[in-house]
Amino acid sequence: SEKLILKIQKERICFDDLSNRNILLDLISFFNYEIAMFLDADEYLDVRFSNLSSYLSDNRLAYLIPMVNLWDSEKMFNAEYPYSISGISPRYRMFRNFGHCQIQSSKRLHFQQVPCVQNATVASEILVLHSGMLTDEMRKQKFERYLKEDTENCQSSYEHIRPKKCPKLRSVEEITQEELYNLNIR
C-alpha cells in the first residue's frame, strides 16, 4: 500500500501541539486516504508489530496505539510509566478518513490526538517505540521544556521524567502479541 509522509515547519511562537496536528489534518484533507496515523519524529514502529494494513478493512473510526518509552537503551523501556499498563501506554494516534476534520481540545499539550474517539479499539498489531526519553540528558531537556511550556497545567506532574530517576525497566523483546491484544480487554 502507498504511504504519504507530511512534515510541517512553521514559525515557533510556543509549543502548540494541537495547532501542529490540526495543520496536518488540514493538509491531509486534500488526499484520498483510508487511515492516518500521527508519529512524532522521535517515534518509530517496532518491526515485529507494524501491520498497519490489517486495519484497512474494519469499520473502526479511531485506534489507540500501544506505545513504550525507551529508557537508557533502545532495548529497554520504562515499565513504571504513569497511566500505562506495565509500561505500555495506549494512545489515540490512528484514525479513519471521514473528511475534513479537526481535533477539538481545550489543551495545547497532552490531548487525544485523533479527531474522533467513537467506535475505537486498541490496534494490537502495532507497537510504537518512543525514543524521546532515551537518555538522561534527553529526559532533562524534556522535563525542563514541559515545565516551561505547560502553562495550562495540562498534566499534573512531570516528575516521572525528571533526570536521574531509576524506574523499573523491561525489555522491548518481552512484549508479546498476546500482551498487546489483552490491552483491548482492560
What annotation goes with each model-predicted range?
Residues 1-14:
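Acidic donor-binding segment of Leloir-type glycosyltransferases
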Residues 22-35:
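Active-site nucleotide-sugar/metal-binding loop of Leloir-type enzymes
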Residues 17-22, 44-186:
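Catalytic-site signature of metal-activated, phosphate-bearing donor transferases
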Residues 7-8, 35, 77, 129:
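A near-ubiquitous, low-amplitude feature marking generic local secondary-structure context
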Residues 32-46:
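Short beta-strand-to-loop acidic/aromatic patch adjacent to the donor-nucleotide binding site
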